[in-house]
Amino acid sequence: MSAVAEPQPSVALHPDIAALAPLLGTWRGAGHGQYPTIESFDYHEEISFGHLGRPFLTYRQRTRAADGSRPMHAETGYLRRPRPDHVELILAHPTGITEICEGSLTIADGELRMDFDSTHIGRSSTAKLVTALGRSFRVAGDTIEYSLRMAAVGEPLTHHLAATLRRD
C-alpha cells in the first residue's frame, strides 16, 4: 500500500472536505526557522495532502537541512473540517509530541486560509517541553505559505517557522 498521504484519485473526495480540495497534492519549497534558544536555520520542505474518501485529509510533512545533508523534522496526521468554518489538525511528531489544533477556515478572493491554535499537546516522558503551538496556512493557486508559532522550553508563544511551497 502506498503512503496514506498520497492523493487517491480513484476515490471520490468526501463532500464534507470538498472545500479543502485546494490543499490536495504534494508541495515543495524552502523555509526559515528561528527561536530564542537556537541558531536560525534554513530548510527544504515537502508537504503532502491526500484523501481516502473519508471526511478528513491525510497530512505528511518532511524537512531536510537546506544543504540536503540531513533530515530535520517530520509530522504525520489528519486535517478535519467538522463545520464549514472550523478545522482541526491532529498530528504526531517523532520527537514524542502529539498535537491537536483547532481553528478557523476562510475561503475568499481565491484564497484558502486556516489559522490554528493548539488545544492539546501530548508528550512522551523524553520529549522536550512544548506547551503551545499555533499555525497559519494560506493557499493561493499553486502556492502555500505557512507560519508556525511555538511555546517551548520556558519560552512564550513565539514565531518559529515560515515557508513558501509550490505544488508539484
UniProtKB/Swiss-Prot annotation:
- Kindly state the positions of the motif GXWXGXG in this protein: 25-31
Q: Which reaction does it catalyse?
A: peroxynitrite = nitrate
Cofactor(s) required for function per UniProt: heme b
- Coiled-coil positions: none
Role of this protein:
Heme-binding protein able to scavenge peroxynitrite and to protect free L-tyrosine against peroxynitrite-mediated nitration, by acting as a peroxynitrite isomerase that converts peroxynitrite to nitrate. Therefore, this protein likely plays a role in peroxynitrite sensing and in the detoxification of reactive nitrogen and oxygen species (RNS and ROS, respectively). Is able to bind nitric oxide (NO) in vitro, but may act as a sensor of peroxynitrite levels in vivo.
Gene3D superfamilies, per this entry? Answer: 2.40.128.20
SUPFAM superfamilies, A to Z: Lipocalins
**Top class in the EC scheme:** isomerase
Looking up InterPro entries in the UniProt record yields: Calycin, Nb(III)_bact/plant, Nitrobindin, PeroxynitIsom, THAP4-like_heme-bd
The annotated pathway is: Nitrogen metabolism
User: Which family is this protein grouped under?
Assistant: Belongs to the nitrobindin family.
Which domain of life does this protein belong to?
Answer: Bacteria
EC number(s) stated in the UniProt entry for this protein: 5.99.-.-
The domain comment in this protein's record states: Forms a 10-stranded antiparallel beta-barrel structure able to accommodate a hydrophobic ligand in its interior. In fact, this fold hosts the heme group, which is located in a wide surface cleft.
Protein name per its UniProtKB record: Peroxynitrite isomerase
Q: Which GO terms describe its molecular function?
A: heme binding; metal ion binding; peroxynitrite isomerase activity
